[in-house]
A protein has these predicted regions:
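Short, flexible loop segments at boundaries between secondary-structure elements
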Residues: 207-232
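A polyanion-binding, active-site-adjacent surface
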Residues: 8-188
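An acidic- and aromatic-residue-enriched active-site/binding cleft used to recognize and process polar
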Residues: 81, 138, 194-195, 218-219
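Intrinsically disordered, low-structural-confidence terminal and linker regions
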Residues: 1-7
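Short catalytic/ligand-binding loop motif for oxyanion handling, primarily in non-cytosolic enzymes
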Residues: 85-88, 142-145, 197-201, 221-226
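A charged, amphipathic interaction segment
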Residues: 170-216
Length: 232
């Protein structure tokens, strides 16, 4: 599917989101939320990590990830669940990008702490390498239907339906395209667990496709808890 002149996934454009606003929707949008480059992470030595994160609120389309034109680079890929209210300009019915709101704030605040608190992951990073940080949603549609407070049961049901229809295979295609063009690539599953174990859906699909990956807690609330700032 093409958006803003960029290939944002491998889904047939004929496959559309048929969801409508829910009675408790406070910010519904049925558009695709493209994956984006969030910034860079550099390992200068065994104990020195630097991060440089983008302000994606301004001209967010500039950061959309184009799967037709992937630079040869080093990548760290965060797999999230699905976009919610903050990820869209619902007034104009257009996407902003993944991990806005509390999720994005916690990535900005705690990213270095998370990496520093994950010895196995930190050791795996190449010395003096700069990695582009890519944020991708396993399901790029708003599974929550913009409900506020979040309707977890509804979100899980919609997410699983989207996952089984097309996003399961599409996620793997997206990740494989990034790996194909990367010098070094780290995949990290940060998808929420939800009430239905969504995190494990992603784990299983990565494993069955022979992809190496790390795991962690979703940043939205978990990274505010020191014990959950880790990748394993």
């Amino acid at each position: 599917m093409i958006y803003n002149g960029k290939k944002i996934n491998f889904i047939d454009p004929a496959i559309t989101n048929s969801l409508n606003p829910h009675k408790n929707s406070k910010g519904f949008c049925n558009a695709i939320c493209p994956d984006q480059v969030c910034g860079t992470i550099t390992k200068k030595n065994s104990k020195n990590i630097s991060t440089n994160l983008n302000n994606r609120k301004n001209n967010p389309q500039n950061y959309d990830f184009d799967y037709d034109n992937i630079p040869e680079d080093n990548y760290i890929v965060f797999i999230l669940e699905s976009p919610h209210i903050e990820e869209f300009d619902t007034k104009n019915q257009i996407p902003i990008g993944p991990a806005q709101g509390n999720t994005g704030n916690n990535i900005n605040i705690f990213l270095r702490d998370v990496i520093d608190g994950s010895p196995m992951f930190l050791t795996s990073l190449q010395m003096n390498f700069t990695y582009s940080l890519v944020l991708i949603n396993a399901v790029q549609y708003q599974a929550s239907q913009g409900t506020k407070p979040l309707d977890r049961k509804l979100t899980d049901e919609n997410w699983i339906n989207f996952w089984n229809e097309n996003f399961k295979s599409d996620l793997i295609k997206r990740i494989k395209e990034i790996i194909k063009k990367s010098k070094d690539c780290k995949i990290i599953n940060l998808c929420t667990f939800g009430h239905s174990g969504l995190h494990y859906f992603v784990n299983a699909e990565l494993r069955v496709n022979g992809l190496s990956f790390y795991e962690g807690y979703h940043p939205s609330r978990n990274w505010a808890i020191p014990q959950r700032r880790k990748i394993w």
